[in-house]
Amino acid sequence: MFETIIGLEVHCQLNTKTKIFCSCPTSFGDKANVHVCPTCLALPGALPVLNKEAVKKAIMFGTAVNATINKKSVFDRKNYFYPDLPKAYQISQFTIPIVEHGELFININGENKRIGITRAHLEEDAGKNTHEEGRSLVDLNRAGTPLLEIVSEPDMRSGDEAVAYLKKLHSILRFINISDANMQEGSFRCDVNVSIRPKGDEKLYTRVEIKNLNSFKFVQKAIEYEVARQIDAWEDGKYSELVVQETRLFDTSNFTTRSMRSKEDSAEYRYFPDPDLLTVEISDEMLEEARKIPELPNEKKERYINELGLKKDDAEVIISSYEHAKFFEDLINAGHEPKLCVTWLNVELNGRLKNGLTIEDSPIDSAKMSDLLSRIEDGTISQKAAKEVLDFIMENIEISVDDVIKKLGLKQVSDDATILAVIDAVISKNEQKVAEYRNGKDKLFGFFVGQVMKEGKGAFNPAKVNELLKQKL
């Protein structure tokens, strides 16, 4: 039996308007090499100037994970050569990072588990290489984008735990609004460090790094494959031959890993303090300001339970992502009843999102959902009819709620005179049951409601039917 040891390094792009050491914009998806300057290109004489906003966002993250904020930290040069790194070194923090000794908690099988965060340090992103047949192209728009590298302790023991940690971390970054953490665009990238050891053994064996994973699914699959590969090598007596300290790439076509290069030790990067940048000194005022972070996911959950009366399971679904929570908050801020919001967000809308779609991808936004809930609350349509409206809008996103109600003829009848005429007819047809009801057979009330709704072809407002029936009976 073997135990898996997993540690994660997450590179998170901070959502500052400009790069970490110059004033070039950080926008994504523009034409190649338009957001560059002498500093990005490492032209002689160009000097870096630290972006204060990036420092503030790093402090916010440290606060969110209960970490130590170093009031003095330094930038170092990490020396290596690659085409997308014009200076032939990366400005990073090695000796004294801005954030150390944090933690977050994940829920595994109903149990909370603490995952330590060793450090989080600021650094600049590299450019992007695109490889074509016979040539490689370099785009330096991304070069200099501020990164926060978040390094965990090797506290995870399975792919499930690693994914739970990443989802929790991703959620925190989004909720405190320091990164869009868009995995498809590369603003939330993960390196996985994996090793195995016999159960009960305290020794740490050879660690393999799997580079640049950009989806939770790929993290899970990469860990599963790599653990199986290392166990097979051990059991075949080839562990020292096949499992070496190296960086491996994950092949998304067949869910396997393959060797990329030998893994460097820190000494090989020849770190030394960057002489162009002063020591970062954080004032008490800046520290106090940066620590005023937005409400964290768990804090939202407690508020939803204690103040809005939500069930724990419902609250946990809502805080599962920033987009889900924002959608819910939009509905609450529009004045809708919390439990109605839960039903229509967690059950009705979620249930209609298929093929891996999330609330963020939903064709119906919070404003349109608010319109739908308003029509339920004011009695214009029944909840049953509202489901038809939602189904129609999911396929025809440009149409308004009121237009769908009109088009499908779903508006409820709430006119007293119309409903009373039907009630009188039902009572006249069922005089025996009326007598039984008035003699104490209360359960017959449901019968009368059903008969009135049937005669009204489901178009009557149920609340109004109940109210008028009670008066008549």
From Swiss-Prot:
Its EC number is 6.3.5.-. GO terms for biological process: glutaminyl-tRNAGln biosynthesis via transamidation; translation. Belongs to the GatB/GatE family. GatB subfamily. Heterotrimer of A, B and C subunits. It comes from the Bacteria. This is Aspartyl/glutamyl-tRNA(Asn/Gln) amidotransferase subunit B. Allows the formation of correctly charged Asn-tRNA(Asn) or Gln-tRNA(Gln) through the transamidation of misacylated Asp-tRNA(Asn) or Glu-tRNA(Gln) in organisms which lack either or both of asparaginyl-tRNA or glutaminyl-tRNA synthetases. The reaction takes place in the presence of glutamine and ATP through an activated phospho-Asp-tRNA(Asn) or phospho-Glu-tRNA(Gln). It catalyses: L-glutamyl-tRNA(Gln) + L-glutamine + ATP + H2O = L-glutaminyl-tRNA(Gln) + L-glutamate + ADP + phosphate + H(+); L-aspartyl-tRNA(Asn) + L-glutamine + ATP + H2O = L-asparaginyl-tRNA(Asn) + L-glutamate + ADP + phosphate + 2 H(+). The keyword Nucleotide-binding applies. It comes from Campylobacter hominis (strain ATCC BAA-381 / DSM 21671 / CCUG 45161 / LMG 19568 / NCTC 13146 / CH001A). It holds the Pfam family GatB_Yqey. Gene3D superfamilies: 1.10.10.410, GatB domain, N-terminal subdomain. PROSITE patterns: GATB. The gene is gatB. GO terms for molecular function: asparaginyl-tRNA synthase (glutamine-hydrolyzing) activity; ATP binding; glutaminyl-tRNA synthase (glutamine-hydrolyzing) activity. NCBIfam families: gatB, PRK05477.1-2, PRK05477.1-4.
